[in-house]
Amino acid sequence: MLALEGLHKTFRLGGGWERPALRGVDLVLQEGEFATLIGPNGAGKSTLLNAVAGTFRVDAGTVRLDGQDVTRWPEHRRARLIGRVFQDPLRGTAASLTVEENLAMARARGRRRSLRLAVRGRERRLFAEWLEALGLGLADRLKQPVGLLSGGQRQALALVMAAVTRPRLLLLDEHTAALDPAASRQVLDLTCRLVAEHGLTVLMVTHNMEQALRVGSRTLMMQDGRVVLDLRGDDRRRMGVEGLVERFARVRGQRLVEDRLLLG
Ligand SMILES: Nc1ncnc2c1ncn2[C@@H]1O[C@H](COP(=O)(O)OP(=O)(O)OP(=O)(O)O)[C@@H](O)[C@H]1O
């Protein structure tokens, strides 16, 4: 479904400074796989998601989606195949538009038609049904501007908008991290429900070890621009949070030692 081969990306910061962020990432996600991605700060997790989404061109390597080489496709073209939810609830929805207008916008995107925000009766009933099923109190607020919603409600809406277009791949970049614990749990439950209902293929960045092991079917760990751990099946089931924390501390410790060597 998603196949990454030899991805490299170095950010050039001016004054001759360079920051390598991806140093040869190889990764295959099968259709319907739900992988979580952890790693210390600066490991390259968001850069990897950006490379897949086409936010920038990679320096080397290929990105394949459904067997198509999309490496040179611009972001907007890849967006027809890829849904994405960010950490910031403000990024996935348009604050000045109503809940139903946001949903209409998402549906129009999924159908590859021009944007049409006028919502008719049948469509409104369909939206109400979707939101009713979430049980987050959104169904009665179809005509309210999204700017009036709580962060959790807004993130739930962003998730529904990303899922209803039936993307071939869903990228979740710490999408529950900015929410309070109750909202975070609700949005994570909703994520699992939507993923199961639509049979989505998912790559989800998280800093929560428990989530990284218990949510989805595969756990990846990055360090210094590479995937350094890939757990699934029995290995994953046997791995406890403590074991993962220990592996994480080890890669982070190594990073600190390397940084000290560099600074020294
Ligand atoms: N636009 C950019 N310009 C310059 N450097 C960047 C840019 N984006 C990322 N980097 C650098 O690339 C490296 C990887 O960053 P990235 O944001 O992908 O890490 P991350 O694993 O997502 O970290 P975090 O968990 O803190 O979000 C870091 O050294 C970061 O400073």
Predicted regions and their residues:
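A short, flexible loop at the N-terminus of ABC-type nucleotide-binding domains that lies
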Residues: 1, 10-24, 74
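ABC ATPase NBD coupling module
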Residues: 15, 19, 57, 69-83, ...
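The feature captures the beta-strand-to-loop junction immediately N-terminal to the Walker
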Residues: 38-40
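Helix-to-loop junction immediately C-terminal to a conserved catalytic motif
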Residues: 53
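Conserved ABC transporter NBD signature motif
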Residues: 61-68, 229-231
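ABC ATPase C-loop
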Residues: 162-163
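H-loop/switch region of ABC-family ATPase nucleotide-binding domains
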Residues: 206-207
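ABC ATPase nucleotide-binding domains
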Residues: 236-264
